[in-house]
Amino acid sequence: MSNAMHVAKTGLNAQNSRMQVIANNLANVNTTGFKRDRANFESLLYQIKRASGEQTSVDTNLTSAFAVGTGVRVNNTQKVYTQGSLINTDNALDMAIDGAGFFQVLLPDGRIGFTRNGAFTRNQDGVLTTPSGYVLQPEIAIPESVTQINVSSDGIVSVQIPEQVDAQEVGQLQLADFQNRTGLQPIGENFYIETTASGPPVLENPFAAGFGKLIQGALESSNVNVIQELVDMIETQRAYEVNSKAISGSDDMLRFVNQNL
């Protein structure tokens, strides 16, 4: 395989990976709390034919290098944590974060998962959980015979119990945030886990300095912009086609050499 073919092949692989990222974004356009991904590229090693500053004669030096690149690759995929639109549901156990922060959930393996999906329900013990049954942290239990559930913007959960005049406070919701959110590891089901890159979680009540407020009876929609994703898809298709043509052009050159030399 010629060097040009190899370089173009890396371009095909990189654009294919970007297309997968775009397809995943579009697939999750209606996923509550989903944050879109972005593929970041980086160039591969360069072959230095002649270095900058290399002496070309007794009195002259090369002012710029003769360096040939060997291609491109996807360096990483990065989550874009912009705010999604808030959708009213009128469900007392639906909560949206307006601003920074993540809900904390106890995963089956004992780790803490972090999510922007605030669609909660109650299990058989009245404890707030995700629809999959993962318990919200800190654990909050709602008494069985309540007539109303209220969640304040700063995370205080209170309920109205029959035959009691005053509402009863049953828990305090807490949010987590990170110094480097892009260092979080997505694991599926709309959950992230902390890594050494993200740093440990910073825990605070909602509406504290640097944290968002809670909105009861609402959910945060995906932040995927369908039009932008379609534009990116067309751009990726064009780049893929150009790299394919580079392979075809290199093949034509090799065929010419084989047939005429």
Regions flagged by a language model, labelled:
Residues M1-L261:
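Amphipathic alpha-helical polymerization modules
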